[in-house]
């Protein structure tokens, strides 16, 4: 994805929208609350080759090992390749393969909107809960009809500011690799 880091040896600085561990854990927590901490769940991701997606999924799997999720079972991880139609069809495949499915996490805005549409079209609102990372502009109708009760995303304005700030500081040789505070007085993990 566009928010994935490039190979460490090929960059001078990298910023994350939010910690990968938090993204993974928060998505599991959101879904767990929706399904009462029990039932079959699946992940509908972007492409199997996307480092950010794989990292978030690894953290989701770690979160699911905690005792509070003992009654939740991850039954599948599928990939829609960040293509709306393929993601939609993958969601339909999950409904068919796992009739007792209670929830789907989709850590990709394309996949989340497609999954919410599939839940809506198949009359599964309230039966299969959906969460993940998405854009309010793409999910408004699905929030209103309860197909997607909650989702997350980092603040792109803050991320843009941080990237501009880091680029400016890098160009002026003001980055030393030590933790610091960015221009809006927010803690930055490595400037």
Which residue ranges define each predicted feature?
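Structural recognition of the beta-strand scaffold that forms the well-ordered cores
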Residues: 1-3, 17, 40-45, 76-77, ...
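Extracellular/periplasmic ligand-binding modules, especially the Venus flytrap/periplasmic-binding
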Residues: 107-116, 144, 154-176
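Short, solvent-exposed amphipathic alpha-helices that sit
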Residues: 23-27, 51-71, 86, 90, ...
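Short, hydrophobic alpha-helical segments
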Residues: 31-39, 95, 163-175
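Hinge/cleft segment of the Venus flytrap/periplasmic-binding protein
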Residues: 48-52, 62-65, 162-191
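Short beta-strand elements in bilobed, periplasmic/extracellular small-molecule ligand-binding domains
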Residues: 12, 40-43, 64-84
């Amino acid at each position: 994805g566009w928010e994935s880091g490039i190979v460490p040896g090929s960059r001078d600085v990298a910023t994350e929208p939010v910690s990968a561990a938090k993204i993974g854990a928060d998505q599991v927590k959101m879904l767990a609350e929706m399904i009462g901490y029990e039932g079959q769940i699946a992940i509908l991701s972007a492409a199997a080759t996307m480092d950010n997606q794989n990292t978030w999924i690894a953290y989701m799997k770690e979160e699911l090992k905690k005792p509070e999720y003992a009654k939740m079972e991850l039954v599948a991880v599928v990939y829609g390749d960040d293509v709306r139609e393929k993601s939609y069809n993958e969601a339909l495949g999950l409904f068919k393969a796992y009739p007792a499915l209670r929830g789907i996490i989709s850590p990709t805005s394309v996949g989340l909107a497609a999954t919410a549409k599939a839940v809506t079209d198949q009359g599964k609102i309230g039966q299969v809960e959906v969460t993940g990372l998405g854009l309010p502009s793409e999910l408004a109708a699905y929030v209103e009809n309860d197909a997607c009760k909650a989702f997350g995303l980092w603040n792109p304005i803050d991320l843009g500011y941080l990237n501009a700030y880091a680029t400016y500081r890098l160009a002026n040789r003001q980055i030393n690799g030590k933790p610091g505070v960015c221009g809006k007085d927010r803690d930055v993990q490595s400037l």
